[in-house]
Amino acid sequence: MTTIVSVRRNNQVVIAGDGQVSLGNTVMKGNAKKVRRLYHNKVLAGFAGGTADAFTLFERFEAKLEMHQGHLMKAAVEMAKDWRSDKMLRKLEALLAVADDTCSLIITGNGDVVQPENDLIAIGSGGNFAQSAATALLENTELTALEIAEKSLTIAGDICVFTNQFKTIEELNY
C-alpha cells in the first residue's frame, strides 16, 4: 500500500506521499507519484490503494471539480455518490485525501466523505504512524505544515514496511 499525509497550519496545506508500490510482499516500484495538483493547481490530492486505480479516480474527481467550479466539498460528495453507485468503482479498495484553501477531506471507497479533526489526514498502510507523528509535531512544535508532513512521512517510512522514503510533496499557500 502506501502512506499519504496531509497537514494544515498557518495558511498552508500540504499533502505528501511515499513512492512505494507493492505487489504482495514484493516492492514493484519505489518512485511512484501518488500526490498531484488538480483543478488549475488549486486542489491537492493523494491516493492510497492500488496504483492502477489512481488514474481513474483522479480523472473522475477532477471532472467533478470542473463540474462544480472547484468547490471541493460539492465535488467530493458527488464523487462519493458515484463511488457508491458505480459497479466498477465499488470494487476499488482505495482512499483519496484532498485539500484546498478551505478544507481537507477523506473520500472513501464506501462513499464516505470525512472532514477530519484538526485538518490532519493520514491514510494508507503507514497512516497510523504518520498521524501519530504529525499530531505530536502539531501539538508540540512550531514547525510548518510542510516540515510536519515531511517528518511524519519519514517516521512512517521508518516503521511501515509498505512505505518508503521517496516523497512527493505538494503545498498550497493561501
UniProtKB/Swiss-Prot annotation:
Subcellular location(s) of the protein: Cytoplasm
Domain of life: Bacteria
Keyword line: Allosteric enzyme, Cytoplasm, Hydrolase, Metal-binding, Protease, Sodium, Threonine protease
Binding site for Na(+): 157, 160, 163
InterPro entries per the UniProt record, alphabetical: ATP-dep_Prtase_HsIV_su, Ntn_hydrolases_N, Proteasome_sua/b, Proteasome_suB-type
Protein task: Protease subunit of a proteasome-like degradation complex believed to be a general protein degrading machinery.
Protein name stated in the entry: ATP-dependent protease subunit HslV
Native source species: Shewanella woodyi (strain ATCC 51908 / MS32)
